[in-house]
Amino acid sequence: MATRFPKFSQDLAQDPTTRRIWYGIATAHDFESHDGMTEESLYQKLFATHFGHLAIIFLWSSGNLFHIAWQGNFEQWVSNPTGVVPIAHAIWDPHFGKGAVEAFTPEGGAGPVNAAYSGLYYLYYTLGMRFNSDLYQGSIFLMVLATVFLIAGWLHLQPRFRPSLAWFKNAESRLNHHLSALFGVSSLAFAGHMIHVAIPAARGQRVDWSNFLNTLPHPAGLAPFFTGNWGVYADPQAGPPILTFIGGLNPATGTLWLTDIAHHHLAIAVIFIIAGHMYRTNFGIGHSIKEILDAHKGPLTGEGHRGLYDTINNSLHFQLGLALASLGVVTSLVAQHTYALPAYFYMPQDHTTMAALYTHHQYIAGFLMVGAFAHGAIFFVRDYDPKANENNVLARMLEHKEALISHLSWVSLFLGFHTLGLYVHNDVMLAFGRPEDQLLIEPVFAQFVQVQSGKIIEGIPALFGGPGVTAPGEFLTGWLGSVNANNSPIFLPIGPGDFLVHHAIALGLHTTTLILVKGALDARGSKLMPDKKDFGFAFPCDGPGRGGTCDISAWDAFYLAVFWMLNTIGWVTFYWHWKWISIWGDNVAQFNASSTYLMGWLRDYLWANSAPLIGGYSPSGGTNALSVWAWMFLFGHLVWATGFMFLIAWRGYWQELIETLVWAHERTPLANLVRWKDKPVAMSIVQGRLVGLAHFTIGYILTYAAFLIASTAALYPNGPAAFTPAISAEQAKGVLSEFKAKPVPGGVMLLLPENIVFDFDKSSVKLDADPALNRVVGVIQFYGSEPVEILGHTDSLGEDAYNQKLSEERASAVKAFFEKKGIEAERLTAKGYGETKPVAPNAKPDGSDNPDGRQQNRRVEILIKTEVVPVS
């Protein structure tokens, strides 16, 4: 006889209604509530799932490696990392028509592909991989490892290999293992890989299994390591540096120094391996965590930390809450470090990938943090023992929870009214034609902190640190240069717009925290319902008969906090994205001017950057490489809006809807073959909220993901069929004005100064010239099929023949760039004039050199042969 779902609850399995399905899904992972579950079997099952989880991670990583090696273009990309678009995998989709196949097929490609925005190419390259064979080997290794871990998970569920409860409760041994083995040894292994493989690869030396054992990374061997003389490894006189303490970013790559990264991981390894031997285990030596906690009593803390050892050690929810909070903070830091201190070669030049990774990690951090508070609330309901925690810090926190909640409430109200008040005031001033009367507040405290960390800002003193204050030699040699370099990502220039959005984000963070803290601290009881813990609050939330009980459980706080968390992460990512596309596009002035009022955010960030999504596909315009994101943008809105149907409509509506749907289904021929035996009942309020929250969340993130990737890829094309959106006449006028365009006989002439496009005396287009040239591409596309001449010019220094050749090569390089962006080759002509057509004197009247004049003469001119010149 088949066992009805759910097997873990006989009560639910015998329920004759559809509640059986919904409650079964809702409690599938609530192992504590399952039939026959003991504390020991609970720990054993969770332990086994860890192996399964790791196996899935290894399998996922293996699949990434395998598909890039099989269907990607890794070796081609390695040969030109800034010029070749990385490919994630091929697309085999029977729904694709001719237009889609062409749009997603790169030039010279065999078929449609997906561009990679994951950053994996940059990771693999930085790790020292250079060939597809390296990727295949890594994939096979991880596949084997996944298999081993699956077997290990199964093995630890067998009676002979199940660890005992005492083994799980041995906190000191577990901590030693985590510190030494997991953190320490894994950091040591990574440092070893960096030193033996990645650093030599960056220097052009290949180290693989064939020469790994006989290729020394440093002539001094291990003697300096074990004698503590690590400085030898940084000394260029002693050999190629492998461990350094330079600081900042390598100016040649814009990323962290690999030798600094190796040093960091080796130091972490040593510290953690030592730390993992501090606690008392089998040998009776070392620290006892319980003794430390019991002895730790600070002022005004009552019994201090007495009782916390057993409270934490006996509560999986407490442990999970701590782990989720820690991981949430780390994940948000990863997002910040990805752009401020990037580690992977060439990734800072891939703007779409940088935007995707930042946003991805901030959203994950948000969910982890909300989860931390959710499990904190469950701890208070299920695991908290008031007698074991009398007058300790945990009990005292519960006793003064009203002070915590009221202070958070005050901070949230203050931030909300003042921040919104400033924004609205500025909107009113602009709407009434008085922009000069905006309230613009400089973030002087933040700028002061930047200066104390080494940044030089005129007018702000370095009182506690920085050049001239910190003792010579205390700053890392590379740090000051990196912090103060042009377009340094470490400390961005900030102004009134940053000040306002910073406080808007602070509002979101404090309000989210208020809801979560109140939900957790009130989980056992509140003024309204002091004995709340005695009522269970299972999923139905149809109440134990008291009014309002559906809105005061910890679950409801979690539910409401998710909306605020999403708002907050939305503001964070909006801010990051707009700030960075203005920096990449050398258009910081627009951000500074428009970010101080709400209409500026709506118009100049959201609406202006929606163009590639709104015009993503049409009967007349056809399909392009961003069409799928335009479709996803629409679909995300649909999912998000569906959420409101669940969130606003209540029980009576659901009862009618579900019964109507079931009645209709039961009268179809197919449904009569397999009769639906469960009696339909409406969802509970909580279930309706859960479904609504899921739709709202997924739609919200999907909509912004599509917007983020398509808008960034359109500005900085990094797709197999680069798409630059058509621009309006007004936008074309702005670009023409930016490049000092002027009407000339036969058309309009744009001026590209040398310093925007080329390095001095070079003919290859600079990496950071993309944004400027992309705007020119938009203007060329605006003019449809009009022919374009690209004219190169130099100054008079050097031989005539050399200058002629340089001017021709520069014109050809710009022509090649335009072709790569989709401008038809037959429209483009490249010509070089050398020094023959100066626009300013190369020498002053007295015969001396005229550097300003020579700089004006080193230029590329774009002549669009048209009669329509939208220049004011």
UniProtKB/Swiss-Prot annotation:
PROSITE patterns registered for this protein in UniProt: OMPA_2 (PS51123), PHOTOSYSTEM_I_PSAAB (PS00419)
Domain OmpA-like: 745-868
Subcellular location, principal: membrane
Cysteine disulfide partners in this protein: none
Binding positions for chlorophyll a B3 per the UniProt entry: 645, 653
Short name of any one Pfam family annotated for the protein: PsaA_PsaB
Biological source species: Gloeobacter violaceus (strain ATCC 29082 / PCC 7421)
TM stretches of this protein: 46-69, 135-158, 175-199, 261-279, 316-339, 355-381, 403-425, 499-517, 557-578, 626-648, 690-710
InterPro entries reported in the protein's UniProt record: OMP_bac, OmpA-like, OmpA-like_sf, PSI_PsaA/B, PSI_PsaA/B_CS, PSI_PsaA/B_sf, PSI_PsaB
Reported function: PsaA and PsaB bind P700, the primary electron donor of photosystem I (PSI), as well as the electron acceptors A0, A1 and FX. PSI is a plastocyanin/cytochrome c6-ferredoxin oxidoreductase, converting photonic excitation into a charge separation, which transfers an electron from the donor P700 chlorophyll pair to the spectroscopically characterized acceptors A0, A1, FX, FA and FB in turn. Oxidized P700 is reduced on the lumenal side of the thylakoid membrane by plastocyanin or cytochrome c6.
Span list, region Disordered: 829-861
Family of this protein: Belongs to the PsaA/PsaB family.
Catalytic activity entry: reduced [plastocyanin] + hnu + oxidized [2Fe-2S]-[ferredoxin] = oxidized [plastocyanin] + reduced [2Fe-2S]-[ferredoxin]
GO terms (BP aspect): photosynthesis
Designated gene of the protein: psaB
Topology with respect to the bilayer: Multi-pass membrane protein
Record text on subunit structure and interactions: The PsaA/B heterodimer binds the P700 chlorophyll special pair and subsequent electron acceptors. PSI consists of a core antenna complex that captures photons, and an electron transfer chain that converts photonic excitation into a charge separation. The G.violaceus PSI reaction center is composed of one copy each of PsaA,B,C,D,E,F,L,M and Z, and forms trimeric complexes.
Localisation per UniProt entry: Cell inner membrane
Residue positions binding chlorophyll a B1: 637
Name of this protein: Photosystem I P700 chlorophyll a apoprotein A2
Annotated region (Photosystem I P700 chlorophyll a apoprotein A2), positions in chain: 1-717
EC number: 1.97.1.12
Cofactor binding annotation: PSI electron transfer chain: 5 chlorophyll a, 1 chlorophyll a', 2 phylloquinones and 3 4Fe-4S clusters. PSI core antenna: 90 chlorophyll a, 22 carotenoids, 3 phospholipids and 1 galactolipid. P700 is a chlorophyll a/chlorophyll a' dimer, A0 is one or more chlorophyll a, A1 is one or both phylloquinones and FX is a shared 4Fe-4S iron-sulfur center.
